[in-house]
Amino acid sequence: MSEVVPLDTVDAPAKPIIDFELVTIPEEELEKLYRVIILNDDVTTFEFVILALIVVFEIEESRAEAIAWETHTRGEAYVATLPLEEAKEKVFRVQYAAREQGYPLEFVIEPEE
């Protein structure tokens, strides 16, 4: 049988030992802008692309149509310049909706130079 030691007799360090490093991200890093580029594929319809650009990226219909056409003819097109988290969120929303409809729509998010 093991001996029970009362807790009040156990020596504990006076201060807890905590080892951590505080990492700060400069504000300019948080505010960096990224370009969202839409890529062409042979499956996703013009209608879906145009609607997604209007609803998710809040682009005017005529501009959305121009982006869809440029994507089709050149293989890719510039959509918007946004902070990284916003760009990722919008791309995720469009790609999720695309997958739900069976479309392989893809985007690229790249740092603005």
Put a short name on every predicted segment:
Residues 2-113:
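Terminal domain-initiation and capping elements
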